Amino acid sequence: MMAVFGGKEQIFKMERFALGEFDRSVDGFYKNVQTFSFGVKKKRAITVKISADVPVDVAVANEKGSSVTYKQSIKEGTVGPVPTEDNREMGLIVGIYKGDKATVSVEVWMERP
């Protein structure tokens, strides 16, 4: 979705993905962390909306891989606004404790601060 006259611009959306499923191909055999990357524009702010059936942990990372913000135990809510500063790409990390399972939906949008 494109922003018109400086409004919100959706830059990423994923609905109802499974977290915590058994997976022999990953270390520890459980896919309890999911990462996503997305392009951003400099000097903007992003907001992440989370909806999950059980609480999950959420972090936003810059293009150097450093955590910019972190929120623990979110079931419904938002993280941000988080300034993009000079980044052109950022990432989202969603995690759950080993052995737990969650169905998660995320949406990320960008707007002028």
Spans of model-derived segments:
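Hydrophobic beta-strand segments within beta-rich accessory/binding domains
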Residues: F36-A52, V58, M90-I96
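Exposed aromatic-hydrophobic patches
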Residues: V33-F38, G77-E85
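Surface-exposed beta-strand/loop patches in noncatalytic accessory domains
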Residues: M14-L19, R24-G28, S51-P81
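Edge beta-strands of jelly-roll/beta-sandwich modules across compartments, strongly enriched
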Residues: V56-D57, K98-E111
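Non-catalytic, beta-strand-enriched accessory regions in extracellular/secretory proteins
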Residues: L19-A45
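Short connector loops at helix/strand junctions that flank enzyme active sites
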Residues: K41-K43, D53, E76, N87, ...
